[in-house]
């Protein structure tokens, strides 16, 4: 036997002794327990992860529902604001039209009064001019006493006709 074969023999014997001691002190059982414990821990973590995922899905559903409700509420608020704005605009338009109608009527009344005042003033001026012209004409043709009597009578006649 040469040295290499002897070394191989001793290595094989050492390996068999090592495996025998390992089996005797139950190393494979310890390794199996450790692997089983790790598998149980991983399984537990997976179950917990599933629970967390389910809770997250529920929360997501709730938040989606709340978001949808909030969007609907916002849309309702916007619609109500639009309706109120339209109502206010209509009311303001109506008030403006009423104001314009009142101001137009007032302006027409003032114009009518101004026209009546102008006509009365023109008539009064025309009467004054006619009276003055008649007085001047009669003064030239009639004596003073007869002219004064005629003037008074004419003046009374004109006043009676105008009033």
UniProtKB/Swiss-Prot annotation:
Molecular function GO terms recorded: proton-transporting ATP synthase activity, rotational mechanism; proton-transporting ATPase activity, rotational mechanism
Could you tell me which Pfam families the record lists for this protein?
A: ATP-synt_B (PF00430)
Query: Which CDD domains did the record assign?
Result: ATP-synt_Fo_b
Give its localization.
Cell inner membrane
InterPro entries from the UniProt entry: ATP_synth_b/b'su_bac/chlpt (IPR002146), ATP_synthase_B_chain (IPR050059)
Upper classification of the source organism reads: Bacteria, Pseudomonadati, Pseudomonadota, Alphaproteobacteria, Hyphomicrobiales
Origin species, per record, is: Mesorhizobium japonicum (strain LMG 29417 / CECT 9101 / MAFF 303099)
Q: Which gene encodes it?
A: atpF2
- Report the protein's function: F(1)F(0) ATP synthase produces ATP from ADP in the presence of a proton or sodium gradient. F-type ATPases consist of two structural domains, F(1) containing the extramembraneous catalytic core and F(0) containing the membrane proton channel, linked together by a central stalk and a peripheral stalk. During catalysis, ATP synthesis in the catalytic domain of F(1) is coupled via a rotary mechanism of the central stalk subunits to proton translocation.
**Would you say which domain of life the source belongs to?**
Bacteria
Oligomer status and interactors: F-type ATPases have 2 components, F(1) - the catalytic core - and F(0) - the membrane proton channel. F(1) has five subunits: alpha(3), beta(3), gamma(1), delta(1), epsilon(1). F(0) has three main subunits: a(1), b(2) and c(10-14). The alpha and beta chains form an alternating ring which encloses part of the gamma chain. F(1) is attached to F(0) by a central stalk formed by the gamma and epsilon chains, while a peripheral stalk is formed by the delta and b chains.
Protein name, per record: ATP synthase subunit b 2
The family assignment reads: Belongs to the ATPase B chain family.
């Amino acid at each position: 036997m040469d040295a290499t074969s002897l070394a191989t023999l001793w290595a094989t014997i050492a390996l068999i002794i090592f495996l025998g001691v390992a089996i005797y002190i139950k190393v494979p059982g310890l390794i199996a327990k450790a692997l089983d414990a790790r598998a149980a821990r991983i399984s537990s973590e997976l179950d917990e992860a599933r629970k967390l995922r389910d809770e997250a899905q529920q929360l997501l559903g709730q938040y989606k529902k709340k978001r949808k409700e909030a969007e609907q509420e916002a849309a309702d608020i916007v619609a109500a604001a639009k309706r109120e704005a339209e109502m206010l605009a209509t009311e303001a338009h109506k008030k403006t039209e009423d104001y314009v109608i009142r101001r137009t009527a007032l302006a027409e009344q003032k114009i009518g009064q101004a026209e009546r005042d102008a006509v009365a003033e023109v008539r009064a001026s025309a009467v004054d001019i006619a009276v003055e012209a008649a007085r001047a004409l009669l003064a030239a043709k009639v004596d003073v006493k007869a002219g004064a009597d005629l003037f008074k009578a004419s003046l009374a006649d004109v006043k009676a006709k105008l009033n």
